[in-house]
A protein has these predicted regions:
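Bacterial N-terminal signal peptides that target proteins for export
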Residues: 2-12
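Catalytic loop of the DD-peptidase/beta-lactamase superfamily, centered on the K-T-G motif
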Residues: 3, 26-67, 199-201, 205-209, ...
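Bacterial N-terminal signal peptides
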Residues: 12-21
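Amphipathic, well-packed alpha-helical segments that form the structural scaffold of globular domains
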Residues: 42, 62, 163-171, 192, ...
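Short, glycine-/polar-rich solvent-exposed loops and beta-turns at beta-strand/coil boundaries
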Residues: 49, 224-229
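Alpha-helical scaffold elements that line and support the substrate/ligand-binding pocket
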Residues: 55-57, 61-62, 87-110, 114, ...
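Secretory-pathway/luminal and periplasmic proteins that interact with or process carbohydrate-rich
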Residues: 64-66, 122-129, 139-146, 214-224, ...
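Active-site-proximal loop and beta-strand segments within enzyme catalytic domains
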Residues: 71-185, 199-201, 227-248
Length: 392
């Protein structure tokens, strides 16, 4: 009788121990994953790839790591905190795309509208659709490629003044609309202007009231260089790892809907959770956003992207990348990746979603230049986050 009770107690104890061991094992990968990501991020700053860094990694909707590293201001020796605010460059474009899609859902515009409906005097406006502009297949020349852009970028302009400026450049078109793919900041700046015309409000207000506030992005705004912003980070140009200089000035009226947002890594992770969680757009709109753009001949934009990258000798030229609305869709060793980077004077950013892995990675850097900045650091963090070994 006592032996039976003892056996039952031993069995129960063994079961409890097994459950505790299982629970410990279940928690361990999260802790180990956070430590592994932390090591990658910390070493990037130590090796001089960025003066400062902000990282947010989420898995299954929960934070694995939200942490900041290094310096927000090299001259003042101010450390980066999780509330420090970085410019995110072209990550802005997906917000512009979503604003257009929301207006389309409300029947206030169509993505098949010709640009001439909103900017009648812009060159070739009768031949270009809003959707082609979203896909970078409009052929509109990229104004940031202008040789004098550094000087042009110092001048504050209204949206209409900027659209007029783009339309009067010596070159306005790279190719016939719909026949090729070429990244165009001009197209997305103009799309920001379309949002303003249709919504009847400044782009900053549209973003704030329809996107940032509802999602709880408390440290995010369309940037204004004259505004005093708590936690604003100083940006740097990098000639090489560890060799930084203060970045050139740019009026944030110049990037507009193509690249003017400031944010934090944690806020961008919130954005991805809301966007891919179906809380921002209708399912059909989100699906359209992720659908590869097509050229007039029926080929996807990815064919043209591959040719362009190959001709430029760019890394990853042999990997298939497609482009939807302000999002690249690709594969990372069999893992579907939806992403966009950003680069603007002094800053670089990378925001990625791995839908099947349920992993979000946001990396913000206050550096841009050769072998510095967010891109390569984010690549390494992403591979750790989705369980892949480092690239050789």
């Amino acid at each position: 009788m006592h032996i039976k009770h003892l056996n039952k107690k031993l069995i129960a104890a063994a079961v409890v121990c097994a459950l505790l061991a299982t629970a410990t094992q279940a928690r361990a990968p999260g802790k180990n994953l956070a430590a592994a990501i932390d090591t990658v991020a910390a070493s990037a700053v130590t090796s001089g790839e960025s003066p400062g860094l902000q990282v947010a990694v989420f898995k299954d909707g929960k934070a694995v790591l939200v942490k900041s590293y290094g310096s927000a201001n090299l001259e003042q020796h101010v450390p980066v905190s999780n509330e420090s605010v970085f410019r995110v460059g072209s990550v802005t474009k997906q917000f512009t795309a979503v604003a257009l899609l929301l207006l389309a859902e409300e029947g206030k515009l169509s993505l098949q509208d010709k640009l001439s409906k909103y900017y009648a005097n812009f060159p070739r406006a009768d031949d270009i659709t809003l959707e082609q502009m979203l896909h970078h297949t409009s052929g509109i020349y990229n104004y940031t490629s202008e040789p004098n852009f550094v000087n042009d970028g110092m001048v504050h302009r209204t949206t209409d003044e900027m659209v007029e400026f783009i339309g009067k450049l010596p070159k306005t078109q790279d190719f016939e609309p719909g026949t090729d793919w070429s990244y165009s900041n001009s197209a997305y700046f103009i799309l920001g202007g379309v949002v303003e015309k249709v919504a009847g409000e400044p782009l900053a207000t549209v973003f704030k009231t329809r996107l940032f506030v509802p999602i709880g992005m408390t440290h995010t705004a369309l940037d204004d260089e004259t505004e005093l912003v708590p936690g604003r980070v100083r940006g740097y140009s990098g000639a090489a790892p560890g060799k930084f200089t203060n970045a050139p000035f740019i009026s944030m009226s110049i990037p507009g809907g193509a690249g003017s947002i400031r944010s934090t890594a944690a806020d961008l992770a919130k954005w991805n959770a809301a966007l891919f969680g179906g809380k921002v757009l209708k399912a059909t709109s989100l699906a359209a956003m992720l659908t590869p753009g097509r050229l007039n001949d029926g080929q996807t934009a990815g064919v043209a992207i591959a040719k362009m990258m190959s001709a430029a000798g760019a890394p990853g030229a042999n990997s298939k990348q497609e482009y939807g609305y302000a999002l690249f869709v690709s594969q990372e060793d069999g893992h579907r990746k939806v992403s966009h980077g950003g680069g603007i004077y002094g800053f670089s950013a990378a925001l990625s979603e791995f839908p099947k892995d349920r992993v979000t990675v946001a990396v913000l850097s206050n550096a841009i230049g050769k072998d510095v900045g967010a891109s390569k650091i984010a690549d390494r963090i992403e591979r750790v986050a989705i369980g892949l070994p480092p690239k050789k």
